[in-house]
Amino acid sequence: MSDIIEKSVDLLKKANIYFEGRVTSRNYTDSTGVVKSLGVMLPGEYTFGTKAPEHMEIISGKVEVLFEGMESNWESFVGGQYFEVPANSSFEIKVDEITDYCCTYL
C-alpha cells in the first residue's frame, strides 16, 4: 500500500459529515474517472447503506463489520485490509479505534 493514492485528482472541498461528525470523508475523482472517498471514523457503531458496490480499504485502525444478511457473524479488519459491499445493501461497522479509510465506488 502506497502513501500516494493519486497524483492528479478532482477533489470536492465540502466534507461529507455523518453521525454528528464522528465519521467524515471527502470525495474525489481519480484520473480514470473513478469516484473515491478518503475519510476518518471515530470509535463507535454505525450503519451505512450502499447504492453502488463499494471497496472499503482500511488504511489504519481497527473495525468489525456485519454484512447485511449475515446474522451475527462480525468480521474484523485492520490497516492494510479491505472488504467489499454489494450495491443496494447495508452494513454495520464497529470502530474500535480511530480509523482512516478509502472507499472506492465500483
Language model feature labels by segment:
Residues 19, 46-48:
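Short loop/turn motifs at secondary-structure junctions and domain boundaries
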Residues 86-106:
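Ligand-binding loop in jelly-roll beta-barrel domains
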Residues 50-65:
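Short, conserved beta-strand element in jelly-roll/cupin
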Residues 1-34:
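A short, N-terminal "cap"/entry segment at the start of jelly-roll beta-barrel domains
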Residues 32-41, 101:
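Small beta-barrel nucleic-acid-binding modules, principally OB-folds
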Residues 41-43, 86:
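Surface-exposed, low-hydrophobicity beta-strand/loop segments enriched in small/polar/acidic residues
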Residues 70-88:
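Short acidic-glycine-tyrosine-enriched beta hairpin
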